[in-house]
């Protein structure tokens, strides 16, 4: 069972995928948890998620954990498949609840009312590749699976 969950190839593909996704997602998680990088912080984020978006509080907490702890998990390669699946689900929810209504493209020229979902779709693709492939070289998963 451990090999199925933690098993991975000893290659750099998983390493580059998890570092890329983890490093891109971590600042978003830090915005939500600590208010860094112009973020609102935990209390304000929870308020937006539960009142404006109508998410149940446990779901809102899981979203925040996926973007923060999940991103850290990807960076170090711990529970890569679980962290990547969580991020894929969060990005799917972001498309469904927020960004899908704004079309495909990001708001490059400031002419849309919001951001499209192209970024989220890329993150989903990268996350699902990690779910299939695993964390790769220099991951805790690799050491656990031995």
Model segments located where?
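Extended, low-polarity transmembrane helix blocks
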Residues: 1-36, 57-65, 69-146
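Membrane-interface interhelical connector segments
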Residues: 34-55, 59
């Amino acid at each position: 069972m451990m090999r199925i969950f933690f098993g991975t190839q000893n290659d750099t593909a998983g390493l580059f995928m998890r570092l890329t996704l983890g490093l891109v997602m971590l600042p978003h998680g830090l915005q939500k948890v600590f208010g860094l990088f112009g973020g609102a912080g935990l209390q304000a984020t929870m308020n937006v998620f539960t009142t404006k978006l109508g998410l149940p509080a446990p779901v809102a907490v899981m979203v925040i954990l996926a973007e923060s702890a999940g991103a850290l998990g990807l960076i170090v390669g711990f529970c890569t498949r679980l962290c990547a699946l969580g991020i894929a689900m969060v990005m799917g929810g972001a498309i469904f609840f927020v960004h899908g209504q704004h079309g495909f493209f990001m708001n490059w020229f400031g002419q849309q009312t919001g951001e499209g979902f192209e970024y989220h779709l890329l993150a989903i693709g990268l996350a699902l590749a990690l779910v299939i492939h695993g964390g790769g070289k220099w991951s805790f998963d690799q050491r656990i699976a031995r």
